[in-house]
A protein has these predicted regions:
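Hydrophobic alpha-helical connector segments
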Residues: 65, 72, 76-105, 119
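Short linear capping/connector segments at secondary-structure termini
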Residues: 111-121
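Amphipathic alpha-helical interaction segments
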Residues: 19, 40, 90-98, 156-160, ...
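Short, structured helix-loop boundary elements
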Residues: 17-18, 38, 60, 64, ...
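Basic, helix-initiating cap at the start of DNA-binding domains
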Residues: 1-31, 35-44, 61
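Amphipathic alpha-helical packing segments from all-alpha helical-bundle domains
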Residues: 69-75, 102, 119-155, 159-170, ...
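Short hydrophobic/aromatic patch on the recognition helix
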Residues: 45-56
Length: 192
């Protein structure tokens, strides 16, 4: 097959997968996890059921694929925040702020049933480890630069940041998220 034909087929497959994942996520948001069926997903995505089954065997697989994509997008956003700053302090603040706003946004859109289903997956544990490593490395860099306290091990400071900023999921206003980031950063500064 010519390369152009292969590229077109690959693009079409990606579009069908994306439309399917978006349709399933939208249906869960509207109807709840248990009300979503393959028929409803196919109808919402604008494809036939037979086509849908060529891509995904069940709703759970669709939602796991959607969640995996969301996680990858969030991690990439944090990496971009880190890479967009030029000093250890600025990198740390940028990543903490980005993480807080991701938590704020996703926490307001996850119902508890969906979150319980998605967060039992091993991909979530892997993503948490990547997040932990990213933040720990920034804290270690900040400690070496004198902008992060050294009297507490970086792993403990990482846990502090992640737990503190996860509270942003329950905050209503972006200003409150900004204040939470400032308080978290204040706890990271060297004493004295």
């Amino acid at each position: 097959m010519p390369k152009l034909w292969n590229d077109t087929i690959d693009a079409h497959r990606r579009e069908v997968r994306e439309a399917t994942m978006e349709a399933a996520a939208a249906l869960v948001a509207e109807l709840g996890l248990r009300a979503v069926t393959m028929s409803r997903v196919a109808e919402r995505a604008g494809i036939g059921r037979a086509t849908l089954y060529k891509y995904f065997p069940d709703v759970e697989t669709i939602l796991r694929a959607w969640h995996e994509r969301q996680i990858a997008t969030h991690l990439e956003h944090l990496v971009q925040a880190r890479d967009g700053a030029d000093t250890p302090a600025a990198r740390l603040e940028a990543v903490l702020k980005a993480y807080a706003f991701v938590s704020h946004h996703t926490g307001r859109h996850h119902d508890t049933e969906l979150a319980a289903f998605l967060h039992q997956d091993e991909q979530v544990a892997k993503a948490r480890q990547q997040l932990h490593t990213l933040l720990r490395d920034l804290l270690t860099e900040g400690a070496s630069a004198g902008v992060v306290r050294v009297d507490i091990p970086p792993d403990e400071l990482t846990a502090y940041c992640l737990h503190a900023l996860s509270a942003s999921a329950g905050l209503r206003a972006p200003d409150a998220v900004e204040r939470l980031v400032k308080v978290t950063l204040a706890g990271l500064r060297p004493p004295g």
